[in-house]
Design a protein with these regions (language model features):
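Extended, low-hydrophobicity acidic Ser/Pro/Thr-rich
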Residues: 2-353
Length: 353
């Protein structure tokens, strides 16, 4: 909630500054370069337009229907005055204009549109920004120092979440290091691409794999979990140990069945399942019932930081889409800020005795 308030205050400050310098804005138009954006389908690599929002999900807890986590994090978007587009000259955003041209020509592939969640004007606006962000994320991970920093930060944050649930982290470290080693080995990239493109993932970058495919899909499921999971974890006659044991059994059975259908037994998805078996019991108990209030709030804070980061980086008022270099700088700054916030919160929380 605090992150949402801060995001809104930043937007309001930007609005006031522009009102002073430009003399107001037109509430009735949503234009880019003076041209109203059409709603056009964006093709995927396979040449097909997919309407299903559950396309290629890795989730083990999902129902067939798509459930957005937008409702839980709309506090910074629910005010129409915040969502309205200012009449600043978007033609000055040269890099964004490149993305807009690619999107208008149908050259931006993606697994699912998150235009509404990200606060974009349309699918074309979402695709244009996504085209830019993919290149900025690639710039960040191309830097060895930054890539190592991101790897270590993710390792620390996830391990801390487990520790705050009173869990041993040795098995997690082993599984995490294995998947990082797999991803960093260029020999595996073709295999990884075969696996993920079969699930309609359009790019192997941070947005498509980590944010969209793994985290946001998981948060979608958390918002409206399957009834069977709710029934199990909300049963007051079962102890936490019994709930955890039952959930672990369900996960193991589900993953065993999924592993038999994998394209590669030693591929990316298999490594991801190893992590899932370790992380899911703690997170499921936190979000669906069975954990302490303190741990549930901690996991909710993690979710909020990720979602707020996603909304922020798609906002032209927060991130400079003027050039690849400036977008990369702002994206890295926003990412570093969110990571620092998470690390501070995790380090300040008392570990369970």
């Amino acid at each position: 909630m605090l992150a949402s308030v801060i995001t809104r205050l930043r937007i309001i400050e930007t609005d006031i500054n522009r009102l002073v310098t430009e003399g107001g804005y037109d509430r009735g138009k949503k234009f880019i370069c003076g041209i109203s954006q059409p709603q056009m389908p964006l093709r995927l690599r396979c040449g097909t337009v997919f309407s299903s929002r559950r396309t290629g999900s890795l989730s083990l807890l999902s129902e067939d229907s798509f459930h957005s986590c937008f409702d839980d994090f709309s506090s910074c978007l629910d005010d129409p005055s915040v969502r309205e587009t200012l009449t600043f000259d978007r033609s000055s955003l040269a890099f964004y204009q490149e993305g807009l041209e690619e999107a208008a020509n149908g050259n931006v592939d993606f697994r699912k549109s998150r235009a509404e969640f990200c606060g974009c004007d349309s699918d074309v606006d979402f695709a244009a920004k996504l085209w830019c962000l993919r290149r900025a994320f690639a710039n960040i991970v191309a830097d060895e120092h930054r890539r190592l920093w991101l790897t270590n930060a993710g390792r620390q944050i996830m391990a801390d979440l487990l520790r705050h649930d009173g869990r041993e982290t040795r098995e997690f470290y082993s599984a995490y290091d294995d998947i990082i080693e797999f991803v960093n080995n260029e020999v595996n990239h073709e295999k990884m691409w075969e696996e993920l493109s079969a699930r309609k993932v359009a790019d192997l970058g941070m947005w498509d794999v980590l944010l969209d495919f793994v985290l946001l899909d998981a948060f979608d499921d958390i918002t409206h979990p399957p009834a069977t999971i709710i029934a199990l974890l909300s049963n007051k006659f079962l102890t936490r140990k019994m709930k955890e044991s039952s959930l672990s059994t369900v996960l193991w059975t589900t993953i065993s069945a999924k592993r038999r259908r994998l394209l590669y037994a030693d591929g990316f998805i298999n490594h991801f399942y190893n992590l899932t078996l370790i992380m899911t019991p703690s997170l499921a108990l936190a979000f669906f019932g069975g954990s302490s209030d303190a741990y549930r709030e901690l996991c909710q804070f993690f979710k909020e930081q990720v979602c707020s980061f996603v909304v922020e980086i798609f906002n032209l008022q927060n991130i400079r889409y003027t050039s690849l270099e400036e977008l990369t700088e702002d994206l890295h700054s926003s990412l570093a800020s969110r990571i620092e916030t998470l690390q501070t919160r995790l380090s300040n929380e008392l570990l369970p005795t």
